[in-house]
């Protein structure tokens, strides 16, 4: 069965930004078609529960622009890209200072670089 590759990158705040919040992604780099892609973003240097921020997932298909997947607030409120809404779940675990992405029923069209961001 053909495998799909999912690349993870570290997205961190620039050094000149006063906030030293860093986001570290983790998850498999390889998922089979029809399976669920699960990624986690761990926030360090600040609390995910600090008000005023939305925690997002974004992806970039090869040779294309960025596509916003969705975001979550620390309270659990979510908003998803309408074109992906039926396949995507974003959740937050404030006790671990993490938020996660689940993308179900992946296909070759989901091959992309996945970013977490604030």
From Swiss-Prot:
Limits of the Ig-like domain: 20-118
GO molecular function per UniProt: antigen binding
GO cellular component, one term: plasma membrane
Cellular localisation: Secreted; Cell membrane
Stretch list, region Complementarity-determining-2: 72-78
Pfam families reported for this sequence: V-set
Region (Complementarity-determining-1): 45-54
Signal peptide: 1-19
PROSITE patterns registered for this protein in UniProt: IG_LIKE (PS50835)
Cysteine pairings via disulfide bonds: 41-116
Ranges for region Framework-1: 20-44
Region annotation (Framework-3) ranges: 79-116
Keywords (A to Z) from UniProt: Adaptive immunity, Cell membrane, Disulfide bond, Immunity, Immunoglobulin, Immunoglobulin domain, Membrane, Secreted, Signal
Keyword Cell division assigned: no
Biological role stated in the UniProt entry: V region of the variable domain of immunoglobulin heavy chains that participates in the antigen recognition. Immunoglobulins, also known as antibodies, are membrane-bound or secreted glycoproteins produced by B lymphocytes. In the recognition phase of humoral immunity, the membrane-bound immunoglobulins serve as receptors which, upon binding of a specific antigen, trigger the clonal expansion and differentiation of B lymphocytes into immunoglobulins-secreting plasma cells.
Description of how the protein assembles with itself and partners: Immunoglobulins are composed of two identical heavy chains and two identical light chains; disulfide-linked.
PANTHER family, sorted: IMMUNOGLOBULIN HEAVY CHAIN (PTHR23266)
Protein name from the UniProt record: Immunoglobulin heavy variable 4-31
